[in-house]
Amino acid sequence: MSDLAIGLRQVRAEQRAFWRNRAAALFGFGFPIMFLLIFGTIFNKQSTCVDGTIGARGQCVGGAEVPYNNFFVPAMAAWGVITTCFSNLTIGVVNRRDNGLLKRLRGTPLPSAAFVSGVLGSALISAVIVVALTAVVGHLLYQAPWPAHPLPALVTVLLAGLVFCVIGLAITPFIPNADAAPAVVNFTSLPILFISGFFFNFNNAVFADIAKVFPIYWFKESMLTAFGAKPSSGGWNGEDLLVLLIWGVLGLAVTLRFFRWESRRA
């Protein structure tokens, strides 16, 4: 059997395992949809400032004022990708490592590359599904427009999903055990989500500058561009994608250097 066929079979196996794990599926798909329903209902018919700041009188300065859900739907879609490709993947890999599953896999004929490709491929499939589901819910319930630039949106989701998968693998060596994994994942993602303006315009220059260091901010911006909430030329923003690529390369370097197949207790 070719390496490609083995990799595809591993993707299918990972997808089956994902959907059988109801908690992981609910967390990956349920959280973004739940927050979309809550915030989308509360702020429906209101507007927000995109790519600008809010002035003293509440006006949008240096940006565009758009309906709130036109902004919030792509933001929640981005969060769904981060959840499936970073949070769920990281916690799952650490659990497998602590349970000894990764060590046992190394002793089987299954190539390591096939296992990793299966994990990444399954996460990317889930990411595309959660983005599509979020877009459908936003359109049907809140009349948010469909992605204005479908191809850039798909490319952005796949690129960012791969980047966050790699970053997730990169931090697993620094998580001591499976019990600590959820806390570490939430600590490294949730605060950045808030200061990156996923829920509302975070009108603070200091926090905005901090957010721009991390890929979460740039992914949100690229999704806003692809969905049409931000003006662009064809739905692409080279700066956003370049920062994501840089983080992907850094994550890959750390993964290749430090990734462990065995628990420290082994």
Regions found by a protein language model. Give the residues of each.
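Alpha-helical transmembrane segments and their short interhelical loops
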Residues: S112-V185, S233-L245, V249-V254
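Transmembrane helix segments
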Residues: G30, I38-S47, T172-Y217
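Hydrophobic alpha-helical transmembrane segments of multi-pass membrane transport/permease proteins
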Residues: W19-C49, N69-N88, A127-V130, N186-F194, ...
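Aromatic- and glycine-rich beta-strand/loop motifs that create alpha-glucan
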Residues: M1-F31, R265
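Short cytosolic juxtamembrane segments of multi-pass membrane proteins
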Residues: F259-A266
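Alpha-helical transmembrane segments of multipass membrane proteins
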Residues: E14, L37, A135-L140, V166-A170, ...
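Hydrophobic alpha-helical transmembrane segments of multi-pass membrane transport proteins
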Residues: M34, I38-F39, E65-L141
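Membrane-interfacial helix-loop-helix junctions in multi-pass membrane proteins
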Residues: C60-P67, P145-P147, G197-G251
